[in-house]
Regions:
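N-terminal Rossmann-fold NAD(P) dinucleotide-binding loop
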Residues: 3-7
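Short, surface-exposed basic-aromatic patches at helix termini and helix-loop junctions that form
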Residues: 9-15, 34-37, 84-87, 108-112
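Glycine-rich phosphate-binding loop and adjacent beta-alpha segment
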Residues: 73-138
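C-terminal capping/lid region of NAD(P)-dependent oxidoreductase domains
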Residues: 63, 133-150
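A general structural signal for well-ordered secondary-structure junctions
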Residues: 17, 39, 116, 140-142
Length: 150
């Protein structure tokens, strides 16, 4: 849910020159995100394999590193997959209770990445209204959530 909502919001904000890339575990998920226009590219791979994620991420972004990476997973050992594709002075947003912040900090230092790391706490002011507003804006996303969760 969180990943789809982040993709939707990112697509609204990046403008005509932006590039929203999602990392998913299977082709079915990639096809779903693409069919719903929630990303420009969907990479199939495991966030526990940071080298693979880096290679695939750069391949769909013209060889350029990213400004922002948002990690939304429920498995450990995904920190470096979020950090490696991000440019120096870029931002990595960790929105996962599985994140090991010592691994993230030491990993970024070890590979020479000067990135801003933000810890998401699951709350932002007016988050419920923002979510409902986005579901009102996107009937396809609302319908998907209703079928899956109601």
């Amino acid at each position: 849910k969180g990943g789809m909502m982040c993709c939707y919001e990112a697509m609204k904000r990046v403008g005509p020159t932006g590039n929203v890339v999602a990392l998913v575990i299977c082709q079915e998920d990639a096809d779903l995100l693409k069919s719903m226009n929630l990303c420009h590219h969907a990479i199939v791979g495991s966030a526990t394999n940071p080298t693979e994620v880096l290679e695939k991420s750069l391949a769909v972004n013209g060889g350029k590193e990213y400004d922002v990476s948002i990690l939304i997973v429920n498995v450990p050992a995904c920190e470096m997959a979020a950090i490696l594709p991000v440019r120096d002075n870029g931002t990595v947003y960790f929105f996962s209770m599985a994140t090991d912040f010592a691994k993230a900090a030491l990993g970024a230092e070890g590979c020479g990445k000067d990135v801003t790391m933000i810890v998401g706490n699951g709350y932002t002011k007016d988050h419920a209204e923002i979510t409902l507003s986005e579901l009102r804006e996107n009937a396809q996303l609302k319908e998907y959530f209703e079928k899956k969760y109601l």
